[in-house]
Amino acid sequence: LIRYMDVSETLANRIQNNLNDFFNYKQFCELLKTRELTQTRINRALLHIMLGLKKNNVREYMENGGHFYAKLLGFRKDRQDLLSIIAKKSALPLLTRLSDTDSISEIGQKMLRHDILASNLYQSVITDKYKTAFRNEYKQPMLKI
């Protein structure tokens, strides 16, 4: 467990020692919490475990520049002309569709997979909380206003 981001040896031991002693996420976090291990740190570490985000992944990302693409979430229709300018002048590949990943390095594609997994996890929480349909990141339309 200590290979994951934000998981110290102390937290890893507490996780392993309390794996069978809880009924839900909130109760598990309460079992893990100490004066030194805050709720926020525990949440962040457990999220990194769920996402499979390891320290060596982040080290690899940072050693290779940290940023590998810019994902366009939406734009104003009256400013659509700026998209081609941004795409031409940007040092990073501009993603308008997730299927257009050929221009991204292998490391960048790994980072994108982590981003998509995080987005899908977020969507599953939203789906459950608000009883809405799940919106897969690959099928998410670009916002045009």
What kind of region is each of these model predictions?
Residues 1-145:
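Non-catalytic terminal extensions that flank enzyme cores
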